[in-house]
A protein has these predicted regions:
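Active-site histidine-anchored catalytic micro-motif
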Residues: 81-90, 120
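Conserved small/polar residues in nucleotide/adenosyl-binding loops
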Residues: 131-133
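Active-site cofactor/substrate anionic-group-binding motifs, chiefly glycine-
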Residues: 56-84
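Short amphipathic alpha-helices in soluble, non-transmembrane regions
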Residues: 25, 64-70, 108-113
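Short, conserved charged micro-motifs
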Residues: 17-21, 58-63, 101-106
Length: 133
């Protein structure tokens, strides 16, 4: 029997006041097979929410993409205010190896997600440091 390859994903969404928006984003993420949302931390002062979920690595990019797409639909950045600096409706979306997976696999998931977001949503994507391994 093969053990599941599990990664954690921690997208930060630029909405921390409207629970309905965050509930919609989380509902969209949960439509992907094997997703388990572990935590949703809304911050009104920063107007930012950190969602933490785990998922099998083969579904990770799709789950994150669905959340990012829903955030882009629902969050109006032209009206956004908050104490935390932000660049878009989704600021960061790191992947962390949890079990039977590696950082290199997480880097590859990040690259896959970046391509999806750039190509399907026409949203600029910036990839951070470990992306170069």
């Amino acid at each position: 029997m093969t053990k599941a390859k599990i990664v954690e994903c921690v997208p930060n969404f630029s909405e921390g006041k409207d629970k309905a928006v965050i509930d919609n984003i989380c509902s969209e993420i949960k439509t992907v097979d094997t997703v388990e949302i572990l935590d949703v931390d809304m911050g009104a002062d920063t107007n930012r929410t950190v969602v933490t979920f785990i998922v099998e690595s083969k579904h990770a990019a799709n789950a994150a993409f669905k959340g990012i797409r829903k955030a882009a639909e629902l969050i109006d950045m032209s009206q956004h205010t908050g104490a935390h600096p932000r660049m878009g409706s989704t600021d960061v979306c790191p992947f962390i190896p949890v079990s039977n997976t590696t950082m290199e696999e997480c880097v590859n998931i990040s690259k896959e997600l970046g391509e999806l977001v750039g190509n399907k949503l026409n949203i600029p994507v910036y990839l951070l440091s470990l992306i170069h391994i």
